[in-house]
Structures are given as structure tokens and as C-alpha cells.
């Protein structure tokens, strides 16, 4: 099971030279997508326990459009291991406001994390 959120990256999110956005921006999107996945699976927002791994693979810039995917990797009694991927699907061409839809998405960030649901919210069906 998976959920995908898409979002425009405002230029105001860029804090570094080259119009770069910090990596925490993508991790916040992972949190939102992970919460959506947990609600879909268990009817509960869950609590995020932490990341086992995070890889920053390509820069995200102001003016990009990204999609954050949360995919269930495994399900325990109360724990949910989730694989995340942040992809850039549109890229700003220049500072004039022009942008293009990318022929192939650029994978910017990958991560794996664990969420936990309360006993009363845990379901047994996948």
C-alpha cells in the first residue's frame, strides 16, 4: 500500500545559495505522507519512532514541484516500517517563473522509518 502527496516548493522555502531547499523540507513531507498512510492502514495518525536511514540524492530548489511517496514495507503487530521517496516532477527553468514538467522524475531523497500505533488502533489485516 502507498500514498503519494504532491506539492509546489515555494521560493521562500529556499535558504541556501543556488536556490536550494534544506533536507528537512523533504522529511516534513515524509511525515505528512506517513501520517496519511497510517490513517489509511489503521484509522490512526500513529507516532513516528524514527528513521533507520536517510539518503539525500539530489538538490530540491524553490520553484520545483515534488511528490512524496510513503510505501508500507512491513507491518508488525503495532509497528509499521515505511519506505519514503521524494521525487522532483517539475523544475523551475529560471528566475522568470518558467518551469517544465520533467520527462523522468529526479529522486531527491530516500528514507526508511518506523511508525507505531496504539494497541487499540492496531489492525491485523494488510
Summary of predicted features, one role per range:
Residues 1-47, 108-110, 114-126:
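Hot-dog-fold acyl-thioester-processing enzymes
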Residues 34-73, 79, 94, 106:
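Hydrophobic beta-strand-centered segment that forms part of the acyl-chain substrate-binding groove
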Residues 61-62, 71-126:
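HotDog/MaoC-like acyl-thioester-processing domains
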Amino acid at each position: 500500500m502507498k500514498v503519494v502527496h504532491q506539492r509546489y516548493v515555494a521560493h521562500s522555502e529556499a535558504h541556501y545559495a543556488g536556490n536550494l531547499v534544506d533536507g528537512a523540507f523533504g522529511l516534513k513531507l515524509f511525515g505528512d505522507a506517513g501520517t496519511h498512510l497510517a490513517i489509511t492502514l489503521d484509522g490512526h495518525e500513529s507516532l513516528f519512532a524514527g528513521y533507520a536511514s536517510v539518503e539525500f540524492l539530489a538538490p530540491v530548489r524553490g520553484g520545483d514541484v515534488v511528490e512524496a511517496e510513503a510505501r508500507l514495507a512491513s507491518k508488525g503487530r503495532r509497528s509499521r516500517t515505511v519506505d519514503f521517496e521524494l521525487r522532483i516532477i517539475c523544475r523551475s527553468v529560471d528566475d522568470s517563473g518558467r518551469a517544465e514538467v520533467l520527462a523522468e522524475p529526479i529522486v531527491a531523497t530516500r528514507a526508511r522509518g518506523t511508525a507505531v500505533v496504539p494497541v487499540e488502533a492496531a489492525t491485523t489485516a494488510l
